[in-house]
């Protein structure tokens, strides 16, 4: 496969298959959960995922994308959510998959969620950054966005950049450029690791646990017949952080980041990965 397999089509027709303006009815499939995932309105704007002791639930986009901007508003499980993981992510199939993650790790009542971000290329991740958010993500809906283009991946929360992962393939750092991905969301149990490394277990007396998603929106290069078809006016395709964006991101990281693989010298005693320097 060529390194760039996308087509830029300067046609309005391309936009009709490359931009999704958010209907859970039209654009996603609840692909597991046996009824625990539900769409709540005729317009397809609000969806819930639930978890009980028998099963969690999840949905996936109907289309695959090679590059795109995906965002959704989420309201997380309130109260004692220890052992639960609520997600919004991009992923390709297979054993050498690519993946871009937002994962929200639950906690006991009165303690903050951990927002876990990661990037996988060809099945290899280990690029974790984690944050404690500056608001209660269970009280109201907040907007989470992944922008993925050939130069970088940008994670934003309520429009504020919290992480930028650059394409450093020229330095030998893998970057997802070749495999189309679907968008996924899920609510599932991971009590063996999710909360304080597995020390806090899921309190099933609080089940069912429910998270809400609304205003799903994807602007992406849709994978069609082996090519990625992009609209002509995709500003996200060349998006980067300006000086103000960099300043805002560094401010969030200095105040709210609780783990950065680039700073973990015990994990990398021979030196941190090259993208960290």
UniProtKB/Swiss-Prot annotation:
Main location: secreted
CDD domains reported in the protein's UniProt record: GH16_XET
Site positions for Important for catalytic activity: 101
Keywords associated with the record: Apoplast, Cell wall, Cell wall biogenesis/degradation, Disulfide bond, Glycoprotein, Glycosidase, Hydrolase, Secreted, Signal, Transferase
Modifications after synthesis and translation: Contains at least one intrachain disulfide bond essential for its enzymatic activity.
Catalytic activity: breaks a beta-(1->4) bond in the backbone of a xyloglucan and transfers the xyloglucanyl segment on to O-4 of the non-reducing terminal glucose residue of an acceptor, which can be a xyloglucan or an oligosaccharide of xyloglucan
GO cellular component, one term: apoplast
Pfam families to which the protein is assigned, alphabetical: Glyco_hydro_16, XET_C
BP GO annotations: cell division; cell wall biogenesis; cell wall organization; cellular response to auxin stimulus; xyloglucan metabolic process
GO MF, any single term: xyloglucan:xyloglucosyl transferase activity
Residues the record marks as carrying a glycan: 107
Triggers of expression: By auxin.
Signal peptide: 1-21
Subcellular location: Secreted, Cell wall; Secreted, Extracellular space, Apoplast
Protein name as catalogued: Xyloglucan endotransglucosylase/hydrolase protein 19
Family designation: Belongs to the glycosyl hydrolase 16 family. XTH group 2 subfamily.
Residues forming the catalytic site: 99 (nucleophile), 103 (proton donor)
pH dependence: Optimum pH is 7.0.
SUPFAM superfamilies given in the database record: Concanavalin A-like lectins/glucanases
Purpose: Possesses xyloglucan endotransglucosylase (XET) activity in vitro. Does not possess xyloglucan endohydrolysis (XEH) activity. Cleaves and religates xyloglucan polymers, an essential constituent of the primary cell wall, and thereby participates in cell wall construction of growing tissues. Involved in cell proliferation in the tissue reunion process of wounded inflorescence stems. Maybe a downstream target of NAC071 as a consequence of auxin action in wounded stems.
Source organism per UniProt: Arabidopsis thaliana (Mouse-ear cress)
Intrachain S-S bonds: 221-230, 262-276
